[in-house]
Amino acid sequence: MRKRITVVIYLISITFLSAEVFEGYALFTQGSSPGGGGGGGGTTYLMDHNSTVIKSWSHSQGAASLPYLLPDSSIIYPYRVPNPSMNNGGVGGGIQRITWGNDILWNYIFSNATYQHHHDIEPLPNGNILIIVWEAKTAQEAYDMGRQSIDNPLNMMWSEAILELDPDNGEIVWEWHLWDHLIQDISNSYPNYGVVSEHPELFDINNGTAGSSGGPGGGQGPNGDWMHLNAINYNTELDQIVISSAKQSEIFIMDHSTTTGEAAGHAGGNSGKGGDLLYRWGNPQNYDRGNNNDHILGHQHGVNWIHEGSPGAGNLILFNNHHNSNTSGAVIELETPVDENGNYPIEDGEPWGPESFIMVYNDIFTQMQGGAFRQPNGNTLITDCDDAHIFEINVNGSTQWEYNPSGNYQIPRAQKYGLDYFDQTEESITMEISHSTGWNLVGLPLEVENHSYEFLFPESVDGTLYSFGTGYVQETELLVGTGYWLRFSDDGISIITGSNVYELEISLIEGWNLISGTTDPVDLNNIGDPGGIIISGTFYGFGSGYENVDVLEPGESYWVRTSGAGVITF
């Protein structure tokens, strides 16, 4: 029996693998520049639970945060533009959608005098993209709203906004602006005057510093960064958004069911509260409630809802970078007080609950970015950005899998996707087909809609697909049951999605034939040969050379010799 062994070598160091690891694909971008991947180039990797690199994408511009995998196998990549209009840690500015074959389907820039994308994005189920942007405000605009001081030589105050992009036409179809939800208690001569503690749904414009003379994450110069949002996540069931503010040491939830007009006000949407905050947690002193004991979060990153089907579903999980001190971090989980209507009750004069949280892991620290994602089997995938260390722990905190490359790298965040993530129906499956540098004997193990070799094997060399009849024939499409030569410039893996091929009937000519099998391995003893035309011992595959085989593996093709024309069945 022919054994297939694929060796893919990158500059990596995998140190541990356990049987309890969640079987799936880890996606992350690895870069060498400060700021969690910003600056120079980077490489995005899709790696399976056996630590095999399934696919990689090279980028000329470094990552702003983590990439996102779509069910069609393309990725959404937020990256740093060369000359951002506003610059601080986590700066981005560009968002691309890149196919499995490395084609850029679209590329949008959000870097101008008004808006500058930074950190995270969030792909939505409808295909749109939520984008975090700084929104530039002058010192005078801030003073006119009651701000008392500006803490940077730019004389700017960068507010925040969330824009929803329809990538099919480049239009912004929904937006939320933090500037529409301010309060101040300085004077009734300014707008939004009120008692801060009576309005936890609003942001106190005088809370926190408005920028600095220099920023974290790469030694940026003067900036007007006030909130430093760094993560965004969407809850489909609630139609709500959660964001994380490092400089406020808080997370915030708002309603996404509003219109843009409602999002600018204080009424409308499922909550009836417009774009006001539905919930906030981490530092209630920001809205003049609670005390130092209630100040839990510090410079946190990576907040996200735990998905349905995973332990803790509906809870929030995040990486608390400064947990108790500026040199120790932790991954924590919290159960929000959300009710059946998607609202978050709060008592008068009290901070939002919960009073306590679930400690997931506390033996970790990273100054920049970082994140955590719960897996369906109960494990948690954690990323230490500074040390480029991704590791998966079980409920007892024991490491089940880890990735830590040698060299000076950073990884903003990583997340995993299940093996069944790619586009599938009840009748379809996804298969990984490995290939080596040079010529390979390949076959099509599934019924597919698009038979083009450029689509099925996008990393193959153009014009190198050949079948064999009475001689070699150049082809552009693959058919089930037929074998082909195809050339590749590098080792790798292709992912093919389609429906099962349970049985085949193949017509053969006298002499040598090039064939392929079904979705499942085919034992030669189970091949039907009613005419007795197969010459014994003449099934050959190709690896480093020709090899006699006993089993036809899916996705590969084989030579077989016959004594005459006829039909065989699997």
List where the protein language model places each region.
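Sec-dependent N-terminal signal peptides
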Residues: 4-15
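Structural motif marking the loop-to-transmembrane transition
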Residues: 2-4, 114, 484
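Short alpha-helical patches at coil-to-helix transitions and adjacent helical residues
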Residues: 14-16, 225, 555
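Histidine-/acidic-rich catalytic cores in large beta-rich domains
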Residues: 19-427
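Short, surface-exposed loop and linker segments with low hydrophobicity and enrichment for Pro/Ser/Thr
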Residues: 15-24, 232, 457-460, 528-532
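N-terminal exported-region signature
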Residues: 426-570
